[in-house]
């Protein structure tokens, strides 16, 4: 979060990059809060804090360590989806992205492409046993991905700056 905000606000002499850096900071804080809250709720529900044991290292959920209901999985899963959406700049957390590309081109492209998008995807893959417990949650993830793809395509059509379109 800090690195992204500082990178976006790299040209700090102008007000626009600084304002966008604050937006990035806020989005990442919401994402971090959702991830922390999901971990706290999951620990409260299961009494387990070790993700390797909790997720059963690839064994079908629930492994022998913890059982959660479909409704509990939905609550924890929604928090995890919010965390992943914030990290990967999915809708509704993607509004800052077209304006954030005022930073240095190579570093902003590498940093965002190599880290941010992959953080959200890795998180969802890592907690996929929880997501699989709730069909509604799977539809939410698919819907967010679809809406984000359409939004990105429409945004790219009207952008005049190449970096903003990417």
Q: Where in this protein do the model-derived segments appear?
A:
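Hydrophobic transmembrane alpha-helices and their helix-loop junctions in integral membrane proteins
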Residues: 2-166
